[in-house]
């Protein structure tokens, strides 16, 4: 599904990501954790083609993001850490805009928008300007837009920030359903309890370098993920 080999990205003399390699297989929810500035967002933006990286290779279903970015982007969805996008649109205009980009048919988009807007209790707000949305409403809109074209791979940067408990529960269910159907999820989070309960695998990044990765048992053993993370951060 997603293969990252020796990814390196520098800003001037500082390496934001340094020789990072990971593989996310179909059916996996893969968590990506690290302190602020560790390189998580740079990695995610490199995967989805927003940032040009200096060296290494990223492939999605064997397709290089550098060689054929459009083919890769058709297979993925990306939820950034800041959902403040296209605020001049209404909610429904934005969702239709995303559906247009991915060539979703009128019937399919209508059905999917209705399904997810009802789930997230956003139906009555779709005609409103996005500028009037709360942070949580913008995050829900971003989630709906990510699922609208049924991507193979969903990349998310801190997706639970701003969500109420009900919406968080719904998102977790959608993530598991996506993977049960052969898709994959790769997401960053600071909520270690969520990562520990939800993820099949997890990677810990520090100073741009991968310091531990694997199944939850491989990463944490008999300890809590929080204890392991804090111990590694202190080294």
Q: What do the PLM-derived regions correspond to, one by one?
A:
Residues 96, 100, 107-125:
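Conserved ABC ATPase "signature" region
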Residues 213-214:
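ABC ATPase "signature
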Residues 56-67, 71-72:
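Conserved ABC transporter NBD signature motif
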């Amino acid at each position: 599904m997603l293969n990252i080999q020796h990814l390196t990205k520098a800003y001037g003399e500082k390496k934001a990501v340094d020789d990072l390699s990971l593989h996310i297989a179909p059916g996996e929810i893969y968590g990506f954790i690290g302190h602020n500035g560790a390189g998580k967002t740079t990695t995610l933006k490199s995967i989805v083609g927003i940032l040009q990286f200096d060296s290494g290779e990223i492939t999605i279903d064997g397709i290089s993001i550098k060689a054929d970015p459009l083919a890769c982007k058709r297979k993925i969805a990306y939820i950034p850490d800041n959902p403040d996008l296209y605020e001049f649109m209404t909610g429904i205009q934005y969702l239709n805009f995303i559906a247009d980009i991915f060539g979703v048919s009128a019937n399919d988009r209508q059905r999917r928008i209705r399904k997810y807007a009802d789930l997230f209790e956003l139906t009555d707000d779709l005609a409103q300007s996005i500028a009037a949305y709360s942070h949580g409403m913008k995050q829900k809109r971003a989630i709906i837009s990510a699922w609208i074209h049924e991507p193979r791979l969903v990349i998310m940067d801190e997706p639970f920030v701003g969500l109420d408990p009900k919406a968080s529960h719904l998102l977790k269910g959608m993530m598991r359903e996506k993977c049960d159907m052969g898709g994959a999820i790769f997401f960053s989070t600071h909520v270690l309890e969520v990562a520990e309960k939800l993820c099949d695998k997890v990677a810990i990044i520090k100073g741009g370098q991968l310091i531990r990765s694997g199944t939850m048992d491989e990463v944490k053993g008999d300890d809590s993920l929080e204890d392991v993370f804090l111990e590694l951060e202190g080294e």
